[in-house]
Amino acid sequence: MSGTFSRCMCTPAARVFWNAGQVFCTRCLSARSLLSPELQDTDLGAVGLFYKPRDKLHWKVPIGIPQVECTPSGCCWLSAVFPLARMTSGNHNFLQRLVKVADVLYRDGCLAPRHLRELQVYERGCNWYPITGPVPGMGLFANSMHVSDQPFPGATHVLTNSPLPQQACRQPFCPFEEAHSSVYRWKKFVVFTDSSLNGRSRMMWTPESDDSAALEVLPPELERQVEILIRSFPAHHPVDLADWELTESPENGFSFNTSHSCGHLVQNPDVFDGKCWLSCFLGQSVEVRCHEEHLADAFGYQTKWGVHGKYLQRRLQVRGIRAVVDPDGPIHVEALSCPQSWIRHLTLDDDVTPGFVRLTSLRIVPNTEPTTSRIFRFGAHKWYGAAGKRARAKRAAKSEKDSAPTPKVALPVPTCGITTYSPPTDGSCGWHVLAAIMNRMINGDFTSPLTQYNRPEDDWASDYDLVQAIQCLRLPATVVRNRACPNAKYLIKLNGVHWEVEVRSGMAPRSLSRECVVGVCSEGCVAPPYPADGLPKRALEALASAYRLPSDCVSSGIADFLANPPPQEFWTLDKMLTSPSPERSGFSSLYKLLLEVVPQKCGATEGAFIYAVERMLKDCPSSKQAMALLAKIKVPSSKAPSVSLDECFPTDVLADFEPASQERPQSSGAAVVLCSPDAKEFEEAAPEEVQESGHKAVHSALLAEGPNNEQVQVVAGEQLKLGGCGLAVGNAHEGALVSAGLINLVGGNLSPSDPMKENMLNSREDEPLDLSQPAPASTTTLVREQTPDNPGSDAGALPVTVREFVPTGPILCHVEHCGTESGDSSSPLDLSDAQTLDQPLNLSLAAWPVRATASDPGWVHGRREPVFVKPRNAFSDGDSALQFGELSESSSVIEFDRTKDAPVVDAPVDLTTSNEALSVVDPFEFAELKRPRFSAQALIDRGGPLADVHAKIKNRVYEQCLQACEPGSRATPATREWLDKMWDRVDMKTWRCTSQFQAGRILASLKFLPDMIQDTPPPVPRKNRASDNAGLKQLVAQWDRKLSVTPPPKPVGPVLDQIVPPPTDIQQEDVTPSDGPPHAPDFPSRVSTGGSWKGLMLSGTRLAGSISQRLMTWVFLKFSPTSQLLCSHFSRRGALWLQVIGCLQVSFYLLSCSVVLTRYSDAFPYWVSFLVLCGVFVWVFLVLGWLLLYFYSRLHPTQSVLLVTTIRRSVMLSFWLLSSANFGNLCAALWSAPQASYVSFLASYSVGHVISGMFSYVYACLQIWPFLLFMWCPRGVVTSVGESV
């Protein structure tokens, strides 16, 4: 480009512009030479070398001299003068346009969007395009801070009048706010800097390119700021560092950069939480906001930059709302540093957040609300959630000249080899993967030390569960999605439905951010080295103790274990398998061998064997002793016919299936006294031998008052055994003592007729209460009130009424025990660190460390066991409303259910209470376990519209569990405790519910219950009663038995011994337990009188009826084809008459046939013989149909049961019609016998029989024809048709 002369001859006041690195004059288009030094203006930087304005300009260029020639540092807008003039002018007005463009840009000393609008560049055919390739023709290249007439490193858009193939940006789009920057190169980055009029500078960086070598080198005084900029902010974001509070070290700071998890921004959870997008749901309920937050976190949409714009748009649509643009809206949309930023922020503050720019305001409206406002689109490439709330004041910038070096982050080492580990396919493969990672980091063995634990399909570990656990354990592992994080040493992959893990053997581990763990990090992410103490202590043991929980609870169990680990002095099974020790390898190998062999040969489950080993290693002080104990387990011989699990273990350690210990001797006595603290003299009642050898415990007992439910929790010594012990309750206000024997707590064992026990109780009545003894252990006595369905009651039923009145102080409880020491290992509760009632109870898994093993979900660490308080109205087989039955030592909860509207006994129990007791509770007081708010059991306890639904589900769980127990063991305490713990395991699946409607959906099918029962078998499993006669015969026999047995008459009073009816498919003899102690007192006729004449008469009547019914059924099935279905449609007496009539008419017909066939003569016409033979044929045909049906039902008992039953009913109905018609013929013949001869009598009977037989023959043919057709069909057709029917 050159004008008339080779060099410009114009005045120095003529404006200049840059083009292709050369300075030209706007008047003559000739190259401008350097001005003389006296004319140069140092305030204008590079422009002042070629241009001397007539008037002083109000803007300055901060970059001084010297600098590289032909680079308009700080004045990049000079390169935009020529392309703007050329693209917006013609051939004849180009010079005038060039002067006009120069005048506009020189006025402000920069290029801004307002200048483009003033020059009407868009109206003259120019558009902004994103740069996707080479740009032909004239164009103006730009990014957020810089413009140039030539492509440059970091350019993102181009302004041109050429019709490029890509989609043009929407107007009014402009990639920059002000373009007047300087460009430098530093390492592998290109840095842009500028200064505004107020002296505050902005900086931006972009990756380098091939043209970066021609740029100036970054000045040394800016290197520190550039390090902070690149580490803390993403590319193409012009940032003023004075708006941000910075830290010296980047390890603990925050970073917006996609390649760095940490930066120099001060980490503030209230500012950088990435959750500001939740402000769009402020109009919704708290449950909705919590659900949206959990959903974004669970599915990986939540990142440190927020959530994707399209995701937020979709969630608003799902909730029936949308965002509209409203200048007065409460929600303000901001962008990080520039409007083109992909990092957005939603705020409710009116002031602009420092470091952000305000874009617009919006409000949330329902989708159905008509509005004239423009709908706000959140954008497909925008992320909302940059900050949590606005900073109140602008943060002071740190010193820019601080020369403290930034710690360098090492790049990942290239991998040398990859090793893959595939864990066992037991449903817990995800947790085996994490265990293998930690086992390799600790012990160098890339295998899982965890034992196999079969999980149902709906409880497999998801990627969200694994991510949560990885973060809790701080593992250098990532979940591989589309790509693997380059900094992760361990890669967890999903192979179909199986989790596997790969290790990069030649790579050093690194600390990964959440984005890297989830697997959504960027290509060039950088992670700091993994610290030496990165893996928490006992991390592997924490996983081993929690991996048997439901998968969504494992991470919480790990966190609770690490927060409050149990004592480490004992070597448990998990510690032996996970902790480093000389015996670990041998113990693990021997244990896996025994686990594979012993349960199989003993016919036991693996869960039972694991639980037995855990019991054997309980309180083991050293690893050597644990190894020695494990070596004592005997492998049963293959020649032995049957070996129990107990025989394989040492004699001093039995493989007891019951979680509660049975070895401790029973307590010989106990006494409970409730009294007031202001009483001068405490009353006490206890057996004398208790005072001699027992230990004492004194605690406070509180009464939580309510309209229908008052609970008294008495914290006492060891487990309370009521059988054979004395229990007394005293009232200090009235000075009266009521013996619990008057209430018959143990079904007759402690009755008023026992004078010795009453004397023992009354003998200690006047002694004071000793408050000096400590409380070594505890049990819980729960007193509750319950209103029966029927207010009437038998005279023998013993009701209990508890009267209420408000006392003046708290109530003290004195409990005494004897027989064992306080340090017994079977003590149910350790209250050495108990909490007061006015403080929140610590319900973490560390304070209540339940470990859901395969055989015992309630087994705990540290010799502590949880108290499972069974809710009301949920009783198992043998339970009663008045649970005063004898309890074994396995019970840690004693329930007294009080009955309303019942007659008061002679000495009612008065329990005093006070609200003031809550503030002065004894520190040893024990509080009942609190379940999550929306768990199934909590919903049952809280009541409400869904309580009945969950109660029915609980009853179904109890019924299915009872079916797996031996009938005679269903009322034992061990079975009841197993039922409660099974329900607790089922209830655990609803602990993560966030709504009251989720628990019912999770537990509706109960598909997981059979596998759970198989993993955790009952104490006495149900035996296999299958025999050779199994099949349809057994099914039909059960059905006939249920139809034939008359239901017992309903009693007048309430039935107390059977709250939940037994399942309908259980045989009658299985309903009543045949062994074991009764769980509750039965009716007076069974308990008190026993052999009275009423009971004998009732049992005799039932026995006679059963014998007669079975006899008549057998006779009828042998000699008459009348359907048993009639027994269910007619009364028993009517069905009996029909059977007798059928037998009689068959006998008469056989008699007539014998007379005709044996005494044949000419007196009998041939047509009579023919009719008789036809009748015989009809009977034979129907009998053959019956036999075919019988044999087919035996050959195919399971394929077409419904089809066989339908045809059977039809054939039986045909026989019934034939029998009825023949009986009518017989009656008519007998009625006409005096007037007719012997021959005519037989002939008339035969004729009638043939007529009725032909009718039944046609009916039977129509019914048997489908049966004969299906007899010759293939099995598949029979099965499909049977299922369709």
UniProtKB/Swiss-Prot annotation:
Domain Peptidase C32: 269-385
Protein name stated in the entry: Replicase polyprotein 1TF
Site feature location: Cleavage: H180, S181, G385, A386
C4-type zinc-finger residues: 8-28
Protein's organism: Porcine reproductive and respiratory syndrome virus (strain Lelystad)
InterPro entries: Arterivirus_Nsp2_C33 (IPR008743), AV_PCPalpha (IPR008741), AV_PCPalpha_sf (IPR038155), AV_PCPbeta (IPR025773), AV_PCPbeta_sf (IPR038154), Nsp1alpha_Znf (IPR054104), NSP2-B_epitope (IPR032855), NSP2_assoc (IPR032841)
Keyword Transmembrane helix: yes
Cellular component annotations (GO), alphabetically ordered: host cell cytoplasm; host cell membrane; host cell nucleus; membrane
Active site: C76 (for nsp1-alpha papain-like cysteine proteinase activity), H146 (for nsp1-alpha papain-like cysteine proteinase activity), C276 (for nsp1-beta papain-like cysteine proteinase activity), H345 (for nsp1-beta papain-like cysteine proteinase activity)
Chain positions covered by the region annotation PCP1-alpha: 69-182
GO terms for MF: cysteine-type endopeptidase activity; zinc ion binding
Segments forming a coiled coil: none
Residue intervals of the Peptidase C31 domain: 69-180
